[in-house]
């Protein structure tokens, strides 16, 4: 794939070890770091020194933690491409993940697409797993869904619905609001079995909760953020039920066909499929 076709961007806030693992996995699989823009949201550890040592396409150092929405917008605008991949920094990538992700979107006329995921501890051979899983499930798609761990977004989407809400206090709710706009505009989205990531899981948010003296079960953002969706309690409840039923149906179908699904969690050295 022509590298000028895409750009990759992610935000980080401390947790340099996870950022390093992410970058190392990209280098290991031959990904071009000159297509990557990293936004640092006021880290106080060694993150900035590490980023300075890399041949990145761009790096933006914010004076404070401006949140994901602001950072994602900064990255998408700093390095504009036909496809912008927005992702977390606590992920490990797999062979051909970019080509498979964007290729699937183009073949199926999707404007937003996410890869399949395994979340939890990295206590297995992810590379071997991902190669096998991508081969098995390369033609499988969950239409009408996506996740914020990784999104490939076509440039037309920015023109149709705009960018992420640049409000720092949303603290992780930016993706929910963006997904609502995708649905309202009837933009075609999907999740593909052709591309896989390992996601350690909410590393930055967990660290921010500790900074604020919050328990892991506590929400990080403002408790009434849901009001921004302008939906009644009943509307939100019905949508959640429908989503859960659809996810269950996808999982059952994939397990029957492949013995695995597009979303798994590692628990006690085993895969839990969902």
Where are these regions (language model features)?
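A conserved acidic beta->alpha catalytic loop
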Residues: 40-49
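N-proximal low-complexity "stem/linker" segments adjacent to membrane-targeting elements
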Residues: 1-25
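Short, acidic, metal-binding catalytic loop of nucleotide-sugar glycosyltransferases
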Residues: 24-33
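Short aromatic/hydrophobic "clamp" motif used to bind/position activated sugar donors
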Residues: 84
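Conserved donor NDP-sugar-binding/catalytic core segment of glycosyltransferases
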Residues: 95-127
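A short, conserved alpha-helix in the catalytic core of glycosyltransferases
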Residues: 150-151, 157-162, 168-195, 201
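A recurrent flexible, glycine/aromatic-enriched loop bordering the glycosyltransferase active site
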Residues: 134-156, 171
């Amino acid at each position: 794939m022509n590298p000028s076709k895409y750009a990759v961007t992610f935000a980080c806030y401390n947790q340099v070890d996870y950022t390093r693992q992410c970058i190392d996995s990209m280098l290991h699989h031959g990904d071009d770091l000159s297509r990557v823009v990293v936004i640092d949201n006021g880290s106080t550890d060694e993150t900035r020194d590490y980023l300075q040592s890399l041949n990145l396409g761009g790096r933006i150092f914010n004076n404070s933690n401006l949140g994901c929405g602001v950072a994602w917008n900064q990255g998408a605008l700093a390095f504009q491409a036909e496809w912008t991949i927005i992702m977390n920094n606590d992920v490990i990538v797999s062979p051909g993940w970019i080509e498979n992700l964007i290729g699937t979107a183009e073949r199926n006329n999707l404007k937003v697409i996410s890869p399949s995921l395994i979340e939890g501890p990295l206590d297995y051979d992810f590379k071997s797993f991902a190669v096998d899983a991508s081969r098995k499930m390369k033609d499988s798609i969950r239409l009408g869904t996506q996740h914020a761990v990784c999104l490939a977004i076509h440039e037309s989407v920015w023109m149709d619905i705009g960018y992420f809400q640049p409000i720092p206090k949303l603290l992780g709710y930016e993706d929910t609001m963006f997904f609502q706009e995708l649905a309202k505009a009837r933009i075609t989205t999907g999740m593909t079995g052709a591309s896989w990531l390992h996601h350690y899981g909410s590393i930055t948010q967990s660290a921010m909760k500790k900074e604020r003296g919050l328990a892991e079960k506590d929400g990080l953002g403002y408790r009434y953020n849901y009001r921004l969706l302008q939906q009644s309690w009943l509307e939100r409840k019905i949508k959640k039920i429908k989503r859960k039923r659809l996810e269950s149906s996808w999982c059952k179908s994939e397990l029957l066909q492949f013995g695995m699904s597009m979303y798994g969690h590692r628990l006690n050295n085993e895969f839990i499929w969902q």
